[in-house]
């Protein structure tokens, strides 16, 4: 798994964080200063990259959290096999199967020989854009 670490206080909207083992995109960060002897707390709301589920993280701002390293690649669609797509990476020429995206905007553009951008996050792949 390719991850790095940062503190909760450094998270911004649009950044990525691992919550419950799932890579998520941060959509909201609120910070609350507690009493005289307590430390500041942060409430992070994020949406799972693969599941689309809403997740929350409540933690002190100085707590370490995992941040996934996102590898962006370009590939070419070789075959459409129902709910999966066979893709060839245009840099390494490796072929692999990847799940077809559920978004109608992406699914309508999928056809053989089309180029696509996919992300590899924590050993899993996701189609982000079809050219």
UniProtKB/Swiss-Prot annotation:
Higher taxonomy: Archaea, Thermoproteota, Thermoprotei, Sulfolobales, Sulfolobaceae
Modified positions (Hypusine) in chain numbering: 36
GO cellular component: cytoplasm
Keyword field: Cytoplasm, Hypusine, Initiation factor, Protein biosynthesis
Classification via InterPro entries: IF5A-like, IF5A-like_N, NA-bd_OB-fold, Rib_uL2_dom2, Trans_elong_IF5A_hypusine_site, Transl_elong_IF5A_arc, Transl_elong_IF5A_C, Translation_prot_SH3-like_sf
Location within or outside the cell: Cytoplasm
A Pfam family the protein falls into: eIF-5a
SMART domains: eIF-5a
Role played: Functions by promoting the formation of the first peptide bond.
Main location class: cytoplasm
Domain of life, per lineage: Archaea
GO biological process terms, semicolon-separated: positive regulation of translational elongation; positive regulation of translational termination; translational elongation
Protein name in UniProt: Translation initiation factor 5A
Record-level Gene Ontology MF annotations: ribosome binding; RNA binding; translation elongation factor activity; translation initiation factor activity
Originating organism: Saccharolobus solfataricus (strain ATCC 35092 / DSM 1617 / JCM 11322 / P2) (Sulfolobus solfataricus)
Family of this protein: Belongs to the eIF-5A family.
């Amino acid at each position: 798994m390719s991850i790095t670490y940062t503190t909760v206080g450094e998270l911004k909207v649009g950044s990525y964080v691992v919550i419950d083992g799932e890579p998520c995109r941060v959509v909201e960060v609120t910070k609350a200063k507690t009493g005289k002897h307590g430390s500041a707390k942060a409430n992070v709301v994020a949406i799972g990259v693969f599941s689309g589920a809403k997740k929350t993280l409540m933690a002190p701002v100085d707590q370490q959290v995992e941040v996934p390293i996102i590898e962006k690649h370009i590939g070419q669609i070789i075959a459409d096999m129902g709910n999966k797509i066979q893709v060839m990476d245009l840099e390494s020429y490796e072929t692999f199967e990847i799940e077809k995206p559920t978004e109608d905007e992406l699914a309508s553009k999928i056809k053989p020989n089309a180029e696509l951008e996919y992300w590899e996050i924590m050993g899993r792949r996701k189609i982000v854009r079809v050219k």
